[in-house]
Amino acid sequence: MFESVVQLLEEHEELQQQLGDPELHADASRSRKVNRRYAELSRIVAAHAEWTQLGDDLAAARELAEEDPAFVDEIPGLEEQLDQAQEKLRRLLIPRDPDDARDVIMEIKMGEGGAESALFAADLLRMYLHYAESRRWKTEVLSQTQSDLGGYKDVQVAIKGTSDDPALGVWAHLKYEGGVHRVQRVPATESQGRIHTSAAGVLVIPEVEEVEEVPLDPNDLKIDVYRSSGPGGQSVNTTDSAVRITHLPTGIVVAMQNEKSQLQNREAGMRVLRARVLAKQQEEIDAEASAVRRSQIRTMDRSERIRTYNFPENRIADHRTGYKAYNLDAVMDGALDPVVESCIQADEEARLDALGTDA
């Protein structure tokens, strides 16, 4: 794996020269790609420099120890540091998910459990908004359908990052959140104090950055307009401002009613539609790839029950990684990093295993 480092170091130097070219910054799309790749390679360059320096230090300590026994005590510590640096570099050389630097569109939907599920969907939204705030990401609610008790039947939010580094990207962290989230607690509507189990679904898809990336033929779109409605189905607008867009080739349907303007709802709908079409295209690519390649690209299953939130025990458990902690109150306030990190580490391990199998 380390044989490729020399080529990456050369690529990093070439990108550094490109970043100094004023013409690059005139092309926003190309500039963004170069900056992201440069940020990604900068981590590898720094890790390689650390690994090389520690190797030199260890070699020097061994040589000096032959003449002066005082240097013998330094060798075990340097060996341990070198092993850690090598493992760090090894992980950085794992091929990244090409979408890691992208922003995302997240959809949270109530599932089994009725009103309690809708309230849990609202709790999940609050958790993700607080998590985004802690990472200084920007959020925008695109569409929402509230339930009678103040929860959400469905809510869509766009989450935008602030870094070109793929390792800090929104998709790199939130792609593991897609799936069924189960909650165990006493519902607000429960008079007997019994614990109920309900669930909400989360869908996370990378956002399209350029319109040209996912071209949509107007002839492939069926657009309906209607009056927006609130909880219970009552109309909240006197004009046909809500928009429903159907992509005929794929059957994907997007409905938007959050804005008072039909034009704004249409623009938001097209934004979500492009992301969903892109996600479908990626699914088809993954399906055609070999089993090993699929595991390298997307190793975490996001289609099944992924996590349980047990409020009476203040416990959160991720069923994919085995992560468990008794700080659910903090997690629901946005302290999601340890949970996400467990997913990232499990993903890296799976990718390393896949590379070993492929070799």
Swiss-Prot record:
Modification sites for N5-methylglutamine: Q234
Q: Which NCBIfam families match?
A: prfA, PRK00591.1
Question: Which organism's genome codes for this protein?
Answer: Clavibacter sepedonicus
The answer to whether keyword Electron transport applies is no
Q: What's any one GO cellular component for it?
A: cytoplasm
Gene Ontology MF annotations: translation release factor activity, codon specific
* Main location (coarse class): cytoplasm
The post-translation modification note in this UniProt entry reads: Methylated by PrmC. Methylation increases the termination efficiency of RF1.
Function of this protein?
A: Peptide chain release factor 1 directs the termination of translation in response to the peptide chain termination codons UAG and UAA.
For whether the record's keyword set contains Glycosyltransferase, the answer is: no
Protein name (Swiss-Prot/TrEMBL): Peptide chain release factor 1
User: Which family does the record claim for this protein?
Assistant: Belongs to the prokaryotic/mitochondrial release factor family.
| Domain of life of the organism encoding this protein | Bacteria
InterPro entries recorded for this chain?
Answer: PCRF, Pep_chain_release_fac_I, Pep_chain_release_fac_I_sf, Prokaryotic/Mito_RF, RF-1
Q: Which UniProt keywords apply?
A: Cytoplasm, Methylation, Protein biosynthesis
Q: Where in the cell is it found?
A: Cytoplasm
